[in-house]
Regions:
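Acidic/histidine-rich catalytic neighborhood
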Residues: 14-30, 199-299
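Flexible, glycine/charged-enriched surface loops at secondary-structure junctions
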Residues: 2, 68-75, 134-142, 201-206
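Rossmann-like dinucleotide-binding core of oxidoreductases
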Residues: 1-100, 104
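Glycine-rich phosphate/pyrophosphate-binding beta-alpha loops
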Residues: 173-181, 237-239
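Glycine-rich loop(s) and the adjacent beta-strand/alpha-helix scaffold that form part
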Residues: 1-10, 131-132, 136, 189-197
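A glycine-rich dinucleotide-binding beta-alpha-beta segment and adjacent secondary-structure elements
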Residues: 99, 111-175, 205-218, 342-362
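Extended, charge-enriched "interface" segments that sit outside catalytic cores
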Residues: 235, 247, 252-362
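Internal hydrophobic alpha-helix adjacent to the cofactor/substrate pocket in enzyme cavities
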Residues: 183-206
């Protein structure tokens, strides 16, 4: 297979006044479900566009591209075409979107997403300087493409152990996948199983209805790959059950059973689940009076009620939030964190959907 990367540039040489600001969505998402981490302020991205001038530079130098000059012939990820591919395959496209992404919180270097290339460095600098806001840009690292070998993953068990070589585990690009998260997920599973094997314990296998990692590994070992594999929600038939908000419920108990959580993390997990269950019971069992919710329903633009209705049923109405219902109907002094309220909202909406009901039944 083949893969590539775009150039990096010095953000101090970019005129951001000519670019479109792309702020993050916020939300305070965390990698860990077991601690209240300090989340640093998110840095925005910026959008610029590759137009006719850039396409002309690329076309004039196609013979110098490793991808088009015959040096690299492997198959690359279909969803991440190089700028050479975009120019050749979509000649009538008036322009191509380019994102400038900060490489980190404490650096001025920007990742030029959308311009993966194998052209020489001087050509890359030439086409970068055709972009709006980048006429004086300084390139800090050039993009490049590589060709690599992989092991057909049907040779692996669901533990990522090689069938013919007990004790040898493969993870990442060597299995035919592409992407950071794909590699990291395999590394977690391979590492856990290698440790369990040394300890003589049962293997750790995630099913397709338990985790996206389970979908990824099952696809690899049962179907194999004929192109670099990237995981999408569309590959998961249980995707309504595999959500960010319930990851701790799906995977936390498994991690606890295998000794992957500290005592502090275990207590945090159990406390979070207890809180979510307590809030869910309140919404399920509490009937709200018409006069209590009249203002909330009017603000949401939905019809009023004439008799008490359970909070969980009102929550299914558009633009009605769990926080609003808890505030107006909370005679018992029930408190709830933002995470617990979000879990109630998403869980009810997802679990009552036709597709979710069907797949749970199956």
């Amino acid at each position: 297979f083949k893969t590539g990367t775009p150039p990096r540039v010095d953000g101090r040489t970019v005129d951001f006044d000519e670019l479109e600001l792309q702020p993050g969505e916020g939300g305070g998402y965390r990698f860990g479900a077991y601690a209240q981490e300090d989340i640093p302020e998110q840095r925005p991205c910026w959008v610029t566009w590759a137009g006719d001038a850039l396409k002309e530079v690329v076309r004039d130098n196609l013979d110098r591209s490793a991808l088009y000059g015959g040096s690299i012939a492997g198959r690359g990820p279909r969803d991440c075409p190089s700028i050479e591919d975009k120019v050749v395959r979509f000649p009538d496209a008036p322009r191509h979107q380019v994102f400038l992404e900060p490489e980190g919180l404490h650096t001025e270097e920007l990742y030029v997403n959308g311009l993966s290339t194998s052209l020489p460095a001087e050509v890359q600098l030439a086409f970068l300087r055709t972009l709006p806001g980048m006429k004086d840009v300084r390139m800090t690292k050039g993009g490049y493409a590589i060709e690599y070998d992989y092991f057909p993953p049907h040779q692996l068990r669901h533990t990522l152990e090689l069938k013919d070589v007990p004790g040898l585990y493969f993870a990442g690009q060597v299995n035919g996948t592409t992407g950071y998260e794909e590699a990291a997920g395999q590394g977690v599973v391979a590492g856990i199983n290698a440790a369990l094997r040394v300890r003589g314990e049962d293997p750790f296998i995630l099913e397709r209805d338990q985790a996206y990692i389970g979908v990824l590994i099952d696809d690899l070992v049962t179907r194999g790959v004929d192109e670099p594999y990237r995981l999408f929600t569309s590959r998961a038939e249980f995707r309504l059950l595999l959500r960010q908000d319930n990851a701790h419920r799906r995977l936390g108990p498994l991690a606890r059973e295998r000794g992957l959580l500290t005592g502090v993390q275990t207590e945090a997990l159990e406390q979070r689940i207890r809180e979510e269950d307590r809030v869910a019971v309140w919404f399920r069992d509490t009937a709200l009076r018409p006069e209590a919710v009249a203002g909330v329903l009017e603000e949401a633009g939905t019809r009023p009620i004439s008799e008490p209705v359970r909070a969980v049923e009102l929550l299914r109405r558009p633009r009605v939030s769990a926080a609003q219902l808890l505030e107006v109907g909370n005679a018992d002094g029930v408190t709830a964190s933002a995470d617990a309220l979000a879990a109630v909202e998403v869980e009810d909406n997802a679990s009552t959907g036709h597709h979710a009901v069907r797949i749970v039944a199956e």
